[in-house]
């Protein structure tokens, strides 16, 4: 599943997780932890979940392909 994350300062980040880890990811989002993300330029980073304002989930078949295209931006 690909996550499109918007923060309180209006920045957008992306993350990809296997759907079998969905419960763990959603639990981390609610417990003020850090998650691995890429920014809109494709750079890898860690994001503190307390700054997240909105999360959109894409669980479609082509979600991984969409995420890989985002990750290729910096390469």
Predicted regions and their residues:
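A short beta-strand micro-motif
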Residues: 1-11
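N-terminal regions of proteins, emphasizing targeting and processing segments when present
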Residues: 9, 28-29, 56, 61
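Intrinsically disordered, low-complexity repeat segments enriched in small/polar residues
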Residues: 10, 15, 22, 55-57, ...
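Acidic, low-complexity, intrinsically disordered interaction modules
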Residues: 16-51
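Short, mixed-charge low-complexity intrinsically disordered segments
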Residues: 37-75
